[in-house]
Amino acid sequence: IYATLLTGTPVYSHGITTNDVLKTLNCDNVFSLCKKHGGKTAAAAYHWFGELYNHIPFCIEHDRIQLQSSETIDSGIYYWDDSYPDSHLFADGEFLRQNQNPDFLLIHSMAIDDQGHKHGAGSREYEEAVAIAGHMIANLLPLWLDSGYNIVITADHGINEFGIHGGTDS
């Protein structure tokens, strides 16, 4: 879904059929279009984004923090642990916003998804993860809007009480 959301192309076109497909996309995407028009890009995100839009494979020692790279995502702070706290993630995003001044900034959380897989939809842990992310967004939203950003918030593609998305996920 990450590839489709940021490229606007269907799965059969970009070829990312599961999270296990290790590939750097070679089609237009939000990051490349921003750069094509003179903008700067940044991501505080799961390492998949670095692989999808910059290069493969992700190397913890070299790729975790990338500032002012020459790749599709100019600056990134990437994590690989599904339970990476949203408090850290949003701090990473704010660091990038304040210090790199991107025209397009992606902040991608895995915390809600992680709790959903571990405890299922409707669980106390899942609902708490949603609330934590909601509070952080509510606190940061005025700063982002005052800085001239347009905000788009997307959500996961659903999860059931057993912690499964459906499809090929388990």
What spans do the regions from the language model cover?
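Feature captures the catalytic ectodomains and active-site-proximal regions of enzymes
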Residues: 1-170
